[in-house]
């Protein structure tokens, strides 16, 4: 079972930074995850939330500010933001990046950046339109469906996504076996428990193995490393 480091943040390595991605690209980690979205002036930033509220105590949406306004707001709380172009220039590890594409519209300038990127991306898409755009130049084992609804997997499989993401708290209604039977090549599960959130737990990873998951997204890279050592993966 593949382990994917999800939006990791550690002391000295803020989330969605090159430092956090390179820290997370540890032995045994299959891919590292980050997010990209569009600012109001059409720039592409590596940033998870749709607003600045959680990180900068600023309620403005990312889509409603310029890149410079975003940088100023984050600088007030000693944070920064990088662009997609900076990521593809500065990331030096060989571990693939699972790029969660928050935009559902396949803007031509965004797709062009994807197509010429010098790093290995696994594209995580939320819409069939974005899936169709990246499918033109991306093998299906490098396209993951971050589908908004648990019942949408047939559409994403039909569109050419090779990997389907499920949430851990969906598993009482939908299982990897069900999604495999519908034609998915791989099913990855996003850890999510009331106690640990998306950090993940050894118990969850053990369970995912028993239900035939092909991968798991975890935020606690140290826990993942210990689990891999225990299972002889590293």
Residue ranges and their predicted role:
Residues 1-234:
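Phosphate-group recognition and catalysis centered on beta-loop-alpha active-site segments
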